[in-house]
């Protein structure tokens, strides 16, 4: 839930390990 992945996922995919897509950004916990 914390947007600290430094990655966006406008295409719906996160490449950073442990991160999930909370469009349009990747979040962790």
From Swiss-Prot:
Name of protein: Varv peptide F
One Gene Ontology biological process: defense response
Record has Disulfide bond as a keyword: yes
Disulfide bonds: 5-19, 9-21, 14-26
Free-text note on domains in this protein's UniProt record: The presence of a 'disulfide through disulfide knot' structurally defines this protein as a knottin.
Family: Belongs to the cyclotide family. Moebius subfamily.
Placement of covalent cross-link Cyclopeptide (Gly-Asn): 1-29
């Amino acid at each position: 839930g914390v947007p600290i992945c430094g990655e966006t996922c406008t295409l719906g995919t996160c490449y950073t390990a442990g991160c999930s897509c909370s469009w349009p950004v990747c979040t962790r916990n």
